[in-house]
Amino acid sequence: MCEARYLTGEPELNRYSTSRVNVLRCVALASRERRAPEWLIMQLDVYTSGMALNSGDASPSTAAPLGETTHRPRIAVVGASGYAGGETLRLLAGHPGIEVATVAAHSSAGKHLSEVAPHIDLGHDPVLAETSVDTLRGHDAVVLALPHGQSGQIAAALRAEDPEVLVLDLGADHRLESAEDWSDYYSSEHSGTWTYGMPELLLADGTRQRDQLVGAREIAVPGCNATAVSLALAPLLRAGLLDAERLSAVLPVGYSGAGRAAKQHLLFSEASGSASPYAVGGSHRHVPEVLQNLRRATGRDGQRLAFTPVLVPMSRGILAVCTAPVDEGTSTADLLAALQADYAEEHFITVLPEGVFPSTGEVAGANTLRIGAAVDHRSGQATVISALDNLVKGTAGAALQSLNLALGLPEATGLTRTALAP
């Protein structure tokens, strides 16, 4: 799938094609108008292969070969020993258009990648480097998978040295626009606001967040819970189908969302067979992020959200069960029509037919979000349910979508809609 507007912005090329002539034209225009980097021009075979695979027009056996090249963008991943960083590496290992040049960590520095993430095969077994500006200098892009509050300083130092380096923050440091919201929920100094990495979010002005990611150099990857709730509710609020002041979301979430650090309540003997609510009463840090997204999607203030996550004994996954009052006469068909209007053309979002609802098992390992909806006429409530893999579509997959857009690559390169089962 070649979305030429991502490379050039030329309206006459704003179509899908796997034609090599069209790809050449895209890159030629990008080179002339936007001064495309040399690696982009040199990687036509890689990108054409990715476009064909992503559009379903070719099989791996017929796609153009990668070939030998040293011109692929060089990527550094920081926080590789954690779940988010490890999942990012897993996806990048299958990306045909980039090179994982450096893998860094903090407490695990000095170990081989195979010691902390034996499931990841990069074709070699790198030693995890120390996390420092010196280590990260000289890359085309840096992915920061660090705990909240730890990305701001190193990101600022990297950008000060090289304004052209692309930095993606998988933590929360650069998601919120409001310094007051940041202070209320994170109790530290606000590091500023970066371009938000949720390509599918349709904004109040009719554009998508995707447009802002093309060529971006500072990207804040969304929170996993925020993605599940925001993409479920935004189309329905924009269509005026829900009571915006009485929104509720209850989210069974997998334990990987709590991170990899050893904690008593995350031990198998504590967690197995038990469901545990946490951050009850509006204290979860994704609440202001969801409300920010809903404001941007509708162009209106005043949304109120009761948000309750619940840890359940599964490794990965989020099932966001969202409810809100609806006006009498609003039907399930109305909800599904609004969702389809927003997402019918979105590669990684599936709106399910009436009477069908998603499960976390259907999205495990895939960069997909599945949504079902229904109206309960007896209670006057709408129920909208979305499911995603918190480590893929909720984190690393969203990062890779944004990385592709920022680098001028087809958005779906290196990502799959196919989940693991059972």
List PLM regions with ranges:
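Oxyanion-binding "anion nests"
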Residues: H284-F307, L311-S315
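C-terminal active-site/capping subdomain that shapes the small-molecule cofactor and substrate pocket
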Residues: A320-P422
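Short, low-complexity intrinsically disordered segments enriched in A/P/G/S/L with frequent Arg
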Residues: A4, N14, R34-R35
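N-terminal Rossmann-like NAD(P) cofactor-binding subdomain of oxidoreductases
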Residues: W39-V280, R300, A374-H377, T418-P422
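Conserved active-site and cofactor/substrate-binding residues in soluble primary-metabolism enzymes
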Residues: Y83, T193, C224-L231, G281-E289, ...
